[in-house]
Amino acid sequence: MKKLTSLFVMLLVSASAFAYTSNKIVIPDVEGYKTLKGDFHIHTVFSDGNVWPETRVREAVWEGLDILSITDHIDTRSRKWIKNGIISDDCDRNTPYKLARKLAARSGLLLINGGELSRRRPSGHTNVLFVKDNNKIVAEAEKFDNDNAKATKAGLTEARNQGAFIMWNHPHWEKYAPNKTVIGPVQKKLLKKGFFDAIEVYNGGCGYSPEAHDWCLKYNLAIMGCSDYHGPLFMNVDYKGGAHRVVTLVFAKEKSIKSVREAMDAKRTAIFADDMIYGREQELKLLFDACIQVKDVKWGEKGISCTLENVSSVPVRITKAPGTEKYRYNRSFIIPPFSTFRFSVQPLLDGNTSTKLDPSVKKIEANIFVENFHVGANKPLKTAIKFEK
């Protein structure tokens, strides 16, 4: 009875937190693709979380996500719950997916079956996504319980046989990578054999890893950011302060499981976390152009004026970049979410004195750095605000 009372209180608190405000993440579609928002690493009561699978669906819908994969620990971590009598030894490791899929379908949320292989050092943790049967993966891994490296390889081999998309989780987790983020010997072998499709560059508990970002570029892996939450969403995210969970942005041809998989295989992903965007240059240029719309452009003898409108949940921080010293415009400014900024470009004589705009000029590009759009470790996106008559 005491446990039921505690659960009831938690549900009431959770409901009241959700009733406080809607914090839907708004990211516009980019040219040629739909921008889908997903979380591909999160836990429930079926491993070491304390949230029911259907609640994970409701949280995702409430926050405006399009994709969710519940990735409970399917092997070693689950034994704690077996020992405590919460689940049985022969528990179906696909249960979280089965419990959540009906509500997800009714809610328009794409639900992907997945799990987390959780081995001790030096193997680490790995997510298997788009799997058909987690039980078979566990069975293969647990044949080598006395050797974590062999267990990981066996589990991932079975996952790959099922057509899984495999993500190396939180390589910068201090417990497994004290003081320095490196590719360990086990991961080197797995990389060489082509087991990894992605790296979790941003983790809700560990934050951002610049090293992992650059590894994704070097080894042609998808750039992923996931919450890895174990408790209720409202206990992890300061919604009152305007925060949101970390999400992976998937640039897909349409909203479908098949299209999401195609986009992830093609590495068309990015991360939105802590008011930052992390990804590849190609996708981030498209995303910037979609987020910042240039409106009310006026050409005159003194130059160009316009309104820059931010139509996204991403605050955009801009600084002037080299290459257009013959024009004067703001060196540094921020366009908050869903707001506008008056922007002007004025010609300079000898890079110093204002002058009239040459009427023969038909095209101007104002070079900028987007300081919170990173295309590599500590490397902001360089692009331009373009004007053409």
Q: Residue spans of the language-model regions?
A:
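Ser/Thr-centric signal marking residues that sit
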Residues: 5, 44, 71-75, 227, ...
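Short glycine-enriched loops at secondary-structure junctions
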Residues: 115-119, 172-175, 229-230
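Charged catalytic cores and adjacent phosphate/nucleic-acid-binding surfaces used
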Residues: 2, 20-39, 57, 124-132, ...
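Sec-dependent signal peptide recognition
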Residues: 2-10
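Short, small-residue-enriched loops and turns at beta-alpha junctions
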Residues: 46, 174-177
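A metal-dependent hydrolase metal-coordination microenvironment
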Residues: 22-169, 185, 200-213
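Hydrophobic h-region of N-terminal signal peptides that target proteins for export
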Residues: 10-18
